[in-house]
UniProtKB/Swiss-Prot annotation:
Swiss-Prot/TrEMBL keywords: Electron transport, Heme, Iron, Membrane, Metal-binding, Mitochondrion, Mitochondrion inner membrane, Respiratory chain, Transmembrane, Transmembrane helix, Transport, Ubiquinone
Keyword Cell membrane tagged: no
UniProt cofactor(s): heme b
Binding, heme b b566: H96, H197
TM stretches of this protein: 32-52, 76-98, 113-133, 179-199, 225-245, 290-310, 325-345, 353-373
Source organism (scientific name): Dictyostelium citrinum (Slime mold)
Domain of life: Eukaryota
Name this protein carries in UniProt: Cytochrome b
Quaternary structure annotation from Swiss-Prot or TrEMBL: The main subunits of complex b-c1 are: cytochrome b, cytochrome c1 and the Rieske protein.
Binding site for heme b b562: H82, H183
Protein topology in the membrane: Multi-pass membrane protein
Family: Belongs to the cytochrome b family.
Length: 387
C-alpha cells in the first residue's frame, strides 16, 4: 500500500478503479458507459489491424477487403469484429444516452458531462459514416455521393468544400483517400474526448436512479461494481460474438458485397441502420436546406437539454407523465428508424415529416417544460388530500 501511495500513476489508478465511491443503488443500466469504452477499444484495435491490410484506392479497396476475408489468417474475424463492433458501439451509446434522458442525468450540475457526450456522439456518427464508405461497395459509393452533396447547402463555401472533399468533380480516388485518413484520425480524437468526459464525470460523481445526491450512501467501486461490470461484460461478449460468428452480415447491407459502380444506382440508397432515424428526417423534408438543417439540429439540439430543462426533480422514477413521454419518444425514434429504411415515397415521407416535427416538439418543448404540468397536478393533489 505504501508503494501505491508513493507512485502518482499507480495511486491514480487505485483511486479511480478501487476506492472510487459510487452510489449503492445504481443498476445495470449504468454499465453501458463501461460497455462504450469496451467497444471503443475493440474498434481501435481491430481498426488498426484492418488498416494494415487495406488499400485506399478505388481499384484496390474492395478487393483488398475480399482478400483479407478469404486469404489472410483470421482476416474474416477482423472484418466482422470491426463491422459488428460499430453496430454494438451505437447500441450501447444509444442505451447510455436514453438512460440519461430517463433518469435526468443530463440536468445540472452534469450539464458539461452531457454536452461532452453529445459531442462524442456527433463524432461517432461522422466516424461511422466515413467507415461505411471504405469497403467501396455499391452502397458505400452511393451513400458517399448523396451525403457529401448535402454540404452544398452551406452558403458561399458549400460548393468549394464538396470539391475539396471529393478531390475533383465527383466521388473518386482522392475522396476515398480523404475518408480513410479522417476515419483513422477520428477515433483518436474520440479517445481524447472520452478522457474529458470521464473528467467531467469525476467532478460531480455518478448519478443514480433516484436522481438525488448520494454522498452518504456510497460504496467503493471494487469489489462491488467490478464484479458487476465483469458479469455484464461476459454477457455482452456472448451477444457480440454470437453476431460475429453466426450472423456477421445481419446488421449490414447486401449491396455492399457488390463492387462500386458509378453507372448503376441501387434501387434504395440507405445508410447503416444506426443512422436511419436521422436519414428519415433528412429526406422527409422537401426543401434540401431545411432537410440538412433538421438533420444537424436533431443531434445538436440534444446538447441544449440541460439548459432548457427547469425541472427540480430529475428522475422519471418520481415523474409519471415524464415516464410516459419518454417511452412514447423511444417509440417515435424506432418509428423514424423504420421510415428511414423504407423507399422514399408516400406514405413514408409524409409520416417522416410529421415524426420529425414531433421529435423536435419532444426535445424542445415537452421534455424541458412538462415539469410545470406535473407541478400543477401535484399541488392540486396535495390540496385535495388536505381537505
Amino acid at each position: 500500500m505504501r508503494l501505491v501511495k508513493k507512485n502518482v500513476i499507480i495511486n491514480g489508478i487505485y483511486e479511480a478503479g478501487v476506492r472510487y465511491p459510487e452510489p449503492a443503488n445504481i443498476s445495470y443500466l449504468w454499465n453501458f458507459g463501461f460497455f462504450s469504452l469496451v467497444c471503443l477499444i475493440i474498434q481501435l484495435v481491430s481498426g488498426i489491424l484492418l488498416a494494415m491490410h487495406y488499400s485506399a484506392h478505388v481499384d484496390l479497396a474492395f478487393n483488398s477487403i475480399e482478400r483479407l476475408v478469404r486469404e489472410v489468417d483470421f482476416g474474416w474475424l477482423l472484418r466482422y469484429v470491426h463491422a459488428n463492433g460499430a453496430s454494438f458501439f451505437f447500441i450501447v451509446v444509444y442505451v447510455h444516452m436514453l438512460r440519461g434522458l430517463y433518469f435526468g442525468s443530463y440536468q445540472k450540475p452534469n450539464a458539461m458531462l452531457w454536452v461532452s457526450g453529445v459531442v462524442i456522439f456527433l463524432l461517432l456518427i461522422i466516424t461511422g459514416f466515413l467507415g461505411y464508405v471504405l469497403p467501396w461497395g455499391q452502397m458505400s459509393y452511393w451513400a458517399a455521393t448523396v451525403i457529401t452533396n448535402l454540404v452544398t447547402v452551406i452558403p458561399v463555401v458549400g460548393e468549394d468544400i464538396v470539391i475539396w472533399l471529393w478531390g475533383g468533380f465527383n466521388v473518386d480516388n482522392p475522396t476515398l483517400n480523404r475518408f480513410f485518413s479522417l476515419h483513422y484520425l477520428c477515433p483518436f480524437i474520440i479517445v481524447g474526448l472520452v478522457g474529458l468526459h470521464i473528467i467531467f464525470l469525476r467532478e460531480n460523481g455518478s448519478t443514480n436512479p433516484l436522481g438525488v445526491k448520494s454522498n452518504v450512501d456510497q460504496i467503493p467501486f471494487t469489489p462491488y461494481f467490478t464484479i458487476k461490470d465483469l458479469f455484464s461484460f461476459m454477457i455482452f461478449l456472448v451477444l457480440f460474438f454470437a453476431f460475429v460468428f453466426f450472423a456477421p452480415n445481419y446488421l449490414g447491407h447486401p449491396d455492399n458485397y457488390l463492387m462500386a459502380d458509378s453507372n448503376v444506382t441501387p434501387a434504395h440508397i440507405v445508410p447503416e441502420w444506426y443512422l436511419l432515424p436521422f436519414y428519415a428526417m433528412l429526406r422527409s423534408i422537401p426543401n434540401k436546406v431545411l432537410g440538412v438543417l433538421a438533420l444537424v439540429l436533431a443531434i445538436v439540439v440534444l446538447a441544449f437539454l440541460p439548459f432548457l430543462t427547469i425541472s427540480e426533480v430529475r428522475s422519471s422514477y418520481f415523474r409519471k407523465i415524464h415516464k410516459h413521454l419518454f417511452w412514447s419518444f423511444l417509440a417515435l425514434c424506432f418509428f423514424l428508424g423504420f421510415l428511414g429504411s423504407q423507399p422514399a415515397a408516400a406514405p413514408y415521407l409524409t409520416c417522416g415529416l410529421y415524426s420529425t416535427i414531433l421529435y423536435f416538439v419532444y426535445i424542445l418543448v415537452l421534455f424541458p417544460y412538462i415539469y410545470m404540468v406535473e407541478k400543477v397536478i401535484i399541488k392540486s393533489i396535495l390540496k385535495t388530500n388536505k381537505k
